[in-house]
């Protein structure tokens, strides 16, 4: 067994309690954005992910045709769009997956994906090494912001921590146009947006009685090599301050809710005022309508660079910037400038606020997750939020 496999196995099976299952998360080695093109790729990715065109209203959960699952539209994540991922076994073979509350499908690279193995250096699935593998044979193609992936559907045992899901459907990718720092994606949104039409893994856990409670939660960490954890089947009150504030899901597709407002109270800037928002662990930034994002950026003195399309601030100014405030379910939640500002190049930083023309909702990404404990309740269709320790 190669060293990488050993490390993943130790991580996957050494982090468990009787009440819930803790999955150790890894964090991308750096928060510095290496090139402006990654932001543009991010914008395209999010547009595809939520089915948005520049001139059209959004269709939550992406786009597909009635003839799917042979064709569907869903994202593929690159290394700089999301920073947190964790271990998983498929057919007893180790992979790193991005756990995404903004999608519902599970896919990993197949052995015949030469780009995945040689160019991207991802782990690939070898069907001959799994005794529980069952080929489905149904072809699928997934279109995302900067390319597409395609392959076939299959079924196998999927293990996350000490949870082993039998007969889990997933996609085996044989062609891809881009690389990521993790091998695949495991979606945690509702089954209604599962574009491969396979039951999402967490719903399989519930059906097979593998978790005590139909809830999962995120505790992500910043400025540390320990990325935090994904907790399946429960929550851990020792990881947050006070009690959870709950907000109801307004649509059982994505984790969509009503946000009271977002802004900088100290600078008399308040946007949104009762709007739709999506809690998305698969997006690293805070994304919103162009007018609102422009106002947020201007209130902190950010300058728009027309050459690279970025809102820039001098890194030395971070300590003088205001705290961002989000009003949710009548409570106030805050994000410090150290979290919403991202290093770009020498002495120049960019803001974590990205606009997307054509949307009338907000996407709350990892900028918010890093400061808060997030609980997702499948049974009661609600999100719990508390300040993380």
PLM features: what roles do these ranges have?
Residues 2-96, 104-106, 208, 384-386:
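N-terminal accessory segments
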